[in-house]
Amino acid sequence: DFEIRLYIDEIYIVKKNQKGQKNYEIIWQGESKILLPNGSQLNFKNGKGRGINLKFLRDQKLKIRNRQGGEFFKPDSRRPTKKIKQLLQESDLPPWEREFFPIIFVGDELAAVPNFGIDQKYQADGQVYGLEVNLTQSK
């Protein structure tokens, strides 16, 4: 079953009753792609000077969870810390997709918000290799 929604002058056809998919946690085990419960996909690749610094993944697990509220994010030391909720509200992401939006943790600390950035603590820079994480939304 599907329903039609309107957001910022665009029409969306979305699955009904996605509430059952709300909370999820996935542990990354080296896959290049992970299909999420809402149909979107995370893509992973190594890159020099980009992504989550690989040194943090030696001793801790990379976890993927949906936003649950109260998370904060600081991708740049010269800018203030932001709530994930505020970050997603300021984007053009439709409201019904925000609660399913994946965020990336190293251990229990927020490390990245796909397509938005890496928290300053976890950034790979210069000649350091990192794990790039990109989200492809379901259509």
Question: What name fits each language-model region?
Answer:
Residues 1-139:
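AMP-forming adenylation/ATP pyrophosphatase catalytic core
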